[in-house]
């Protein structure tokens, strides 16, 4: 098996408005020192760009793709159909259906084209970054250490926070 080194995470989203949610994924990845990039690629408005991006992702040293999409949310599934790289889908919360439409679109992929589907909105973006970091950490001891420390700090925050019963 040829293991690729120095893999990065690519965060893609269907529109600029999705960045409000997806920037949280970027912030987590930067805290963990995971190399990442951010791109706006629409499955509907820029399908040729999406196609080219997905086909070149492995050559561009992408190890995990986090794809955020709202509404019909085809971006994660279409990217997953075009690459062997793990794709994590983040449903973006919408005004009309609160992201339920996006969640169902991303989660209900046909067998053979998996998309790891996270929670709707900000929690999903954060967890997608942590999951992507975990995947990259399998071949990167520095990121593995950063992720371990991050999780330990989350535990410490819980124990040092004031009790609501006090």
Regions from the PLM with identified roles:
Residues 9-37, 42-43:
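Glycine-rich phosphate/diphosphate-binding loop of Rossmann-like nucleotide-binding domains
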Residues 18-22, 47, 72-78, 97-100, ...:
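Short glycine/serine/threonine-rich phosphate/pyrophosphate-binding segments
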Residues 41-58:
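N-terminal beta-loop-helix "entrance" segment that forms/cooperates
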Residues 53-91, 95:
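Glycine-rich phosphate-binding loop
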Residues 82-119, 144-146:
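Short, acidic/small-residue loops that bind anionic groups at enzyme active sites
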Residues 121-155:
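A charged, well-structured terminal subsegment
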Residues 159-166:
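Conserved small/polar residues in nucleotide/adenosyl-binding loops
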């Amino acid at each position: 098996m040829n293991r690729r080194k120095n893999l990065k995470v690519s965060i893609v989203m269907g529109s600029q408005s999705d960045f409000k949610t997806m920037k949280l994924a970027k912030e987590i990845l930067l805290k963990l020192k995971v190399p990442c990039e951010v791109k706006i690629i629409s499955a509907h408005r820029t399908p040729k760009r999406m196609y080219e991006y997905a086909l070149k992702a492995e050559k561009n040293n992408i190890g995990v793709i986090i794809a955020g999409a709202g509404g019909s949310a085809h971006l994660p599934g279409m990217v997953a159909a075009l690459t062997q790289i793990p794709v994590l889908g983040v449903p973006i919360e919408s005004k009309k259906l609160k992201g339920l439409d996006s969640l169902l679109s991303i989660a209900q992929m046909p067998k053979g084209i998996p998309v790891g589907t996270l929670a709707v909105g900000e929690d999903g973006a954060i967890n997608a970054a942590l999951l992507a970091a975990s995947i990259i950490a399998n071949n990167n001891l520095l990121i593995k250490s950063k992720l371990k420390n991050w999780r330990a700090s989350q535990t410490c925050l819980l124990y040092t926070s004031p009790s609501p019963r006090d």
